[in-house]
Amino acid sequence: MSDVAIRELNWYLRDHLFRQSNAGKTAFQRESLPGDMATLYLRYKNADLSQLSQTMVPVIEDLVSKKVLEQDGKVLRMRGRLARLQCAKCFYINYLAEAEPRVCLRCQHADLHDFPKKKA
């Protein structure tokens, strides 16, 4: 499993968590996440679910270590809300938890804006 695949899955999983939390869901079954990703994201539509599940292990460990998620057995719970922010330098869309530093996950730039921008 490549570093690129892990970073990409990290972004898609954060996107999934953001969207689900906005719909009121904050607890997830660890085993169902690969299937959910394959169903909801065209990127993983034809993915091998066992491979996707293996790639998800370091991603989930990273999110737990960064206090985005907490693990209770086979259940993953969000520790707070995720903010969707766009980097002013590279335009990357970041999904950051309150506990994480407000820096771009791609270029480490600190100038992040709400995405989409709020209308005045």
Report residues per predicted region.
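Cysteine-rich micro-motifs
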Residues: E100-D111
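Short Cys/His-rich metal-coordination motifs, predominantly Zn2+-binding knuckles/fingers
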Residues: A88-C90, C107-Q108
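A short, conserved structural fragment
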Residues: E61-K74
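Positively charged, polyanion-binding regions of nucleic-acid-associated proteins
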Residues: S2-F28
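Short, cationic-aromatic polyanion-contact patches
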Residues: K74-K89, P116-A120
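Short amphipathic alpha-helical interaction segments
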Residues: L49-D62
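Cys/His-rich microdomains that often coordinate metals
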Residues: N94, D111-L112
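Short acidic, hydrophobic short linear motifs in intrinsically disordered regions
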Residues: A23-N46
